[in-house]
Amino acid sequence: MSLRILDMISVIMAVHRYDKYVDISIDSILNQTYSDFELIIIANGGDCFEIAKQLKHYTELDNRVKIYTLEIGQLSFALNYAVTKCKYSIIARMDSDDVSLPLRLEKQYMYMLQNDLEMVGTGIRLINENGEFIKELKYPNHNKINKILPFKNCFAHPTLMFKKDVILKQRGYCGGFNSEDYDLWLRILNECPNIRWDNLSECLLNYRIHNKSTQKSALAYYECASYSLREFLKKRTITNFLSCLYHFCKALIK
């Protein structure tokens, strides 16, 4: 079924630590040109109640903002909890240290509508801790995603917009500490090979890189290897075998 014009969107964000980037991130969502959304914020971890207290003023200023607390610190738990709180069938991801450009939701939603997609990401602009531009990254389009995904994550997680039922059919996020998103995409690919997903080439989010980023950690590669091994044991295809071998080699090199 095609999406209806003027569908409401649920934007989900987990806040594990309140810092100088959180307000910038929230404001970038509240100032979107597409205004028909709710913003679900999960204050998670040991400081969740203090974080929620610091964010409470947003609920008083804008009734689209809803804040919930979760004492479990792992991101995958927070995102699953956020999904259960979403009222609408379309969900957009957002991280608490990134910046969505003003047209992000509008452009993603319209592209999703026009192409009858179930999930869509965008390109990103890498920025450093001071907000200074580093470079642009663009991701594979729909014709290449299924071929590349077993070997490499084809989506920038905080840029994604997807139909809620796509995530629920896979029982949500089940991943580890560094690559819960990649785990989910692999499960979707293997269970729903005809999934309609794509990436906009336009960069619609500023993605902040920190000195302690998990992007290049060995643990992340080992997690990816374990996901590939699981998929190979479920479906013993050449692609899944090569994917498993590739990720284990990457982990060993790291």
From Swiss-Prot:
**UniProt pathway:** Bacterial outer membrane biogenesis; LPS O-antigen biosynthesis
Q: Which organism is it from?
A: Escherichia coli
| Substrates-to-products reaction catalysed | an N-acetyl-alpha-D-galactosaminyl derivative + UDP-alpha-D-galactose = a beta-D-galactosyl-(1->3)-N-acetyl-alpha-D-galactosaminyl derivative + UDP + H(+); alpha-D-GalNAc-(1->3)-alpha-D-GalNAc-di-trans,octa-cis-undecaprenyl diphosphate + UDP-alpha-D-galactose = beta-D-Gal-(1->3)-alpha-D-GalNAc-(1->3)-alpha-D-GalNAc-di-trans,octa-cis-undecaprenyl diphosphate + UDP + H(+)
User: Mind listing the GO molecular function terms for this protein?
Assistant: glycoprotein-N-acetylgalactosamine 3-beta-galactosyltransferase activity
Q: Which family does the entry's similarity section mention? A: Belongs to the glycosyltransferase 2 family.
Q: What class of enzyme is it?
A: transferase
Q: Does the keyword Glycosyltransferase apply?
A: yes
Q: Which domain of life is it from?
A: Bacteria
Any idea of its EC number? 2.4.1.122
- Miscellaneous notes: O86:H2 and O86:B7 subtypes share the same O unit, but the O units are polymerized from different terminal sugars in different glycosidic linkages.
Pfam families the record matches: Glycos_transf_2
- Function statement: Involved in the assembly of the O-repeating unit during O-antigen biosynthesis.
Task: Please cite one Gene Ontology biological process associated with this protein.
Answer: O antigen biosynthetic process
Report keywords, A-Z. Glycosyltransferase, Lipopolysaccharide biosynthesis, Transferase
Q: What is this protein called?
A: O-antigen biosynthesis glycosyltransferase WbnJ
